[in-house]
């Protein structure tokens, strides 16, 4: 997994979005890696708690607009459905999930944090849904 790292210690899995140069923006590769990471922690009976966080100065600064811009309607819908599937998976996970928000949690990042059972935010954390101002 290139964009998501999983570390496990003392029955805790830490899932880290690792694309700090892009403020951990969500694209297909990140979603794919995140699905693999969720498969791993859900199946591991030694993991009791899952913490989701972001590397660098952002939790997740939303979707990767550069990847989304050229998408046609069908591609955009598929991307949205993939994101929604992941959000529902985190929301319905039997293991407790904690969002450790260390910076920007915008758009899909805010949604992912809200999908977790508990949110812990640093003083530098910023939550928002900037896309509501579009259109």
Please name every model-derived segment:
Residues 1-55, 88:
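Conserved CoA-thioester-binding segment of acyl-CoA-metabolizing enzymes
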Residues 86-94, 100, 106-135:
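CoA-thioester-processing core
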């Amino acid at each position: 997994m290139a964009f998501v790292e999983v570390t496990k210690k003392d029955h805790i899995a830490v899932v880290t979005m690792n694309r700090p140069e892009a403020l951990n923006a969500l694209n297909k590769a990140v979603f794919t890696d995140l699905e693999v990471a969720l498969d791993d922690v859900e199946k591991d009976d030694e993991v009791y708690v899952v913490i989701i966080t972001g590397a660098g100065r952002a939790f997740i600064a939303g979707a990767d607009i550069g990847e989304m811009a050229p998408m046609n309607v069908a591609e955009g819908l598929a991307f949205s459905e993939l994101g929604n599937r992941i959000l529902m998976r985190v929301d319905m996970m039997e293991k407790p999930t904690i969002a450790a928000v260390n910076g920007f949690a915008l758009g899909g990042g805010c949604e992912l944090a809200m999908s977790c059972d508990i949110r812990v935010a640093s003083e530098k954390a910023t939550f928002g849904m900037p896309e509501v101002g579009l259109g």
